Amino acid sequence: VAYKYFKDSELACKHTGENGMDVAFMKVIEAIREECGFPFRVSSAYRHPTHPIEAGKQKPGAHASGKAIDILVSMEQAFILVEVALKHGIIGIGISQKGPIGTRFIHLDMDKSRSRPRIWSY
């Protein structure tokens, strides 16, 4: 699937190279990106269940379902991203806004198999 704002390589699992992103979820992310009006730098998207982060969990997380993405963003843009994501029905939001600016991110997901809606910090 081709997306307007994202390359397959940035959505693929960094462990296997497989892209298992959910198409309906990505349509929502594309709409959020469009409304935000600034580029999204992806730090993590799809993670195959064998990815070291997922393999260490009792049950694979939202990234393994293809319904989660982590966007490197901070300060005012982080606020805008959360505001727009909520408008578009995102039900899982993880906030990591400590440390160097370039490492801060917002996790967005729509994994209804998990306890949602939720917001948490890392």
For each of these PLM feature ranges, what is it?
Residues 1, 14-22, 37-39, 56, ...:
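Generic structural signal for short, solvent-exposed loop/turn connectors between secondary structure elements
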Residues 1-33, 101, 112, 117, ...:
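Extracytoplasmic cell-surface/polysaccharide-interacting catalytic and binding patches
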Residues 1-16, 53-69:
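Short, conserved helix/loop micro-motifs enriched in His/Cys and acidic residues
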Residues 24-28, 38, 51, 67, ...:
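Amphipathic alpha-helical interface surfaces
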Residues 27-57:
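Extended, low-complexity, intrinsically disordered C-terminal regulatory tails
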